[in-house]
Amino acid sequence: MFRKLGSSGSLWKPKNPHSLEYLKYLQGVLTKNEKVTENNKKILVEALRAIAEILIWGDQNDASVFDFFLERQMLLYFLKIMEQGNTPLNVQLLQTLNILFENIRHETSLYFLLSNNHVNSIISHKFDLQNDEIMAYYISFLKTLSFKLNPATIHFFFNETTEEFPLLVEVLKLYNWNESMVRIAVRNILLNIVRVQDDSMIIFAIKHTKEYLSELIDSLVGLSLEMDTFVRSAENVLANRERLRGKVDDLIDLIHYIGELLDVEAVAESLSILVTTRYLSPLLLSSISPRRDNHSLLLTPISALFFFSEFLLIVRHHETIYTFLSSFLFDTQNTLTTHWIRHNEKYCLEPITLSSPTGEYVNEDHVFFDFLLEAFDSSQADDSKAFYGLMLIYSMFQNNADVGELLSAANFPVLKESTTTSLAQQNLARLRIASTSSISKRTRAITEIGVEATEEDEIFHDVPEEQTLEDLVDDVLVDTENSAISDPEPKNVESESRSRFQSAVDELPPPSTSGCDGRLFDALSSIIKAVGTDDNRIRPITLELACLVIRQILMTVDDEKVHTSLTKLCFEVRLKLLSSIGQYVNGENLFLEWFEDEYAEFEVNHVNFDIIGHEMLLPPAATPLSNLLLHKRLPSGFEERIRTQIVFYLHIRKLERDLTGEGDTELPVRVLNSDQEPVAIGDCINLHNSDLLSCTVVPQQLCSLGKPGDRLARFLVTDRLQLILVEPDSRKAGWAIVRFVGLLQDTTINGDSTDSKVLHVVVEGQPSRIKKRHPVLTAKFIFDDHIRCMAAKQRLTKGRQTARGLKLQAICSALGVPRIDPATMTSSPRMNPFRIVKGCAPGSVRKTVSTSSSSSQGRPGHYSANLRSASRNAGMIPDDPTQPSSSSERRS
């Protein structure tokens, strides 16, 4: 049953490693090897590992294991091993203790381990912390112990009589360690300590953490200044954005940690004072007011607004937020009494010494709030200040510190608890009732299905964490539209929806007026107005955020004058944008793709400050080489300018419809008066009256048809809008099963240079909120002869032109622009005045005289019929390869 352990004299090792006898054997190993040597080092390492394993087993299966462990005081052997300073054994010992305390589940077992003072002795032991491996296991061990702290266990660590708390004392020595992993662990340990409800321990902790909390806020100041210095000099390129993201992540993590500490009542008061007097006032507020001392360290206004916004989005402590916002909204610059300066390569907080009279600043009321309003000045070089000013207003709405009364006192629109179920719901219902009831009757149009049926089945679930009123503003339409699609009788849905919302309006009390600073409304309106100018520097994300903030204000302000003036402004700006983009609807062959892509992008909510806040700190990029999406940068070139104006138009149009309560039945664009249901994969269709073309389809990529290289016998059939591949139904003569369906408008057809019987066909999928435009079918269509190939190409080409024409007609109807036949157009607003003419000598050119109608100038919504040359950007399909001569055919 036993076998002798060769190096341990009379010790015999049991076969069962999970037994009390095995622990007794291990205790004997430790007893026989109290002095560490090179010969027994490996034995001790294995013994420590085995002890942790058997103690975890005993915790769950046999209480006598812990009884024996405590009776023989085996932790004392651990201390003796540690005191000998052998690094490998110390590493193994710390790892053993960490595993042991991590896996103990029963409180009784935990109490047994903590019942003597050996754990505190291990915590206080002077390990070689310069060794990275020891430091990693040591800080992990301390962190594991901190998670075991509670009112019942705290007195195993804290001795109230002698005022000894080794865990806290040793951790505080590491708060400024050079490795970020250690600093983060220290923060977590201290947070776990101060969360324990024990009065005597809290008094001790507050006394010993004063310096730490002060250093914590100073590190926040240092991170802010360091990041601001980087932002001042860095270009907006991918590498710099990655570096900036790391700096922002560190700063936001620190703000989150401070916010969690502020939620702990024991340290909230002292920490709140430190945050206000060392960070918020001397750094942030000083940076958004006129400079009063040349030695002051100030942030750029953009950085200050960003940090201010992040602080409001994260921190929920009422006293801190209340103090900060009251200073921001009401105080003068005279309240700033300290500032940060640099002294001997260090940051120091000192009182402000005024070298000259400051009367022009001292008596200026609301200097900080006035700065916020000035951030929306459209004459600035870029929209960075405007974006972060909007972010600040948005964060005020989102903050959970219950400061609504303070904001109301400053004529800042805010939802009060008493009005949440009255005015907010009333304005929401009034804004949306007309659009909801009218859109609820929309059925799914043939061009809206795109080619979802051709892709792999995917289910996307959006589960919002919290449904807020601003979310409801955007979601009412979606919910009602989805119910209309699923209901076979849309009329019933419309009546039910209208009656539901109408009854909600009838039951609401009369509206109450909520005050709004007129200057704030004018400042926000200036962004809308700037969008209508040709030389504006507004990015789409800024306009999107502005529309969101305006909607939030309209939820609380029931002022008819405000609604009327904003509606009028949106109408004027929409007409200006329409006059700019409307002339390209008929003149640009790719306008259809531009509009559909930007509408899909428009439906995506980009206002997510977890991923966009830091990117806007750098100077605005104006080139695709920056790797930024278009909505986050300035446009470059003709196409991007038109795309940006399309997005502007969509946002202004949506805001205007929300203000007037009109339903938008034209968007998303769809072909009107469709006389047939869209075909989907798996449908069985009647082909008695259809013209079929037999072909072999060879996919070039994985798709719904099959794998690349498969040869599939299919029949090609088209309708007005769709390309359909079918397989005959063996059960019904004249019927077929749909195997693929795509939109003709997104189909590209090319001949093959080596085989006249082959067509190369690419069908792209419609863009959506989830996916960009992408090919869903790339395949070769092989026909029996080149005549059938030519017939198929002609049919697909004509079908593509017809489908695109119908879709463009729908876009024109949605925009209110007359549809013009491309064959009648003679000029384009951006046409190159020179073109190569066939038949000319090489290198010679003839100037094309561009003519345009001037009769329609100055009339909004009216556009010239002579927009562009029919040869410019026509939807041409490459010619077929040259066919073999008749003699060669006879030879073959």
UniProtKB/Swiss-Prot annotation:
Residues 48-194 form the FPL domain. Residues 844-856 have a biased composition (Low complexity). InterPro entries: ARM-type_fold, CLEC16A/TT9, CLEC16A/TT9_C, CLEC16A/TT9_N. Residues 844-892 are annotated as: Disordered. Keywords: Autophagy. GO terms for biological process: autophagy; endosomal transport; regulation of autophagosome maturation; vacuolar transport. One of its GO terms (cellular component) is Golgi apparatus. Residues 882-892 have a biased composition (Polar residues). PANTHER family: PROTEIN CLEC16A. Regulator of mitophagy. Belongs to the CLEC16A/gop-1 family. This is Protein CLEC16A homolog. It comes from Caenorhabditis elegans.
